[in-house]
A protein has these predicted regions:
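Glycine-rich ThDP/TPP pyrophosphate-binding loop and its adjacent helix/strand module
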Residues: 1-184
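C-terminal intrinsically disordered, low-complexity extensions immediately downstream
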Residues: 184-199
Length: 199
């Protein structure tokens, strides 16, 4: 009875709203991920699971930690549809997100997208990246999605260099403004620790 009520509330409020869950390839071998797949499918929740497969779970390559190449297929045993896309390409990611949104809104069921991408830097500031070669990183930098988007805008959409520079300046300003706002803001009250956290 409670689950029917919860689902009714969710569907009433989420006709155009979808919960998004982001996880890395390293998390895909954790049991709670399969529990989440099971419940999302069982309760027909409007959830979009997004796997950022950057080939390394912290310092362990995907080939050494997971059997099988298609991580999104692990959700299919729970009846969750999904796909794998080139996560280094803005347009394929955008198209996949639109397909996922439409599927979830039309079927009231979860969906999963595996984004095949890459992490250029270490997992943290203390990660010296000794588990991969500089050649590997440099090769992947050749298809850096930011640089590829810049090239696409210049060549295919005929953007001017000045326009690109203005966009880059605007983005840098936004980042600095957010950083300043964050540093200037007071720390939250300890009472807020569990606000909107549901156990």
């Amino acid at each position: 009875k409670d689950m029917i009520l919860l689902r009714s509330i969710l569907m009433w409020n989420l006709v155009v709203q979808i919960s998004r869950v982001y996880l890395g390839d390293g998390a895909m071998s954790n049991g709670q991920v399969f529990e989440a797949f099971n419940l999302a499918s069982l309760w027909e929740l409007p959830v979009l699971f997004i796997i950022e497969n950057n080939k390394y779970g912290m310092g362990t390559s995907i080939g050494r930690s997971a059997a099988g190449n298609e991580l999104f297929e692990r959700a299919t045993v729970f009846g969750i549809k999904g796909e794998k896309v080139d996560g280094m390409n803005f347009f394929t990611v955008s198209d996949a997100a639109i397909r996922a949104r439409d599927y979830i809104n039309n079927n009231s069921k979860p969906y999963i997208i595996e984004m095949d991408t890459y992490r250029f830097r270490g997992h943290s500031m203390s990660d010296p990246c000794l588990y991969r070669t500089k050649d590997e990183v440099n090769k992947m930098k050749e298809i850096d999605p930011v640089l590829m988007m810049k090239e696409t805008l210049l060549k295919e959409y005929k953007f001017k260099e000045e326009t690109i520079k203005d966009i880059e300046s605007d983005i840098k300003k936004q980042i600095k403004d957010v950083e300043k706002f964050s540093l200037d803001s007071p720390l939250p009250d300890i009472k807020e620790l569990f606000t909107e956290v549901y156990l």
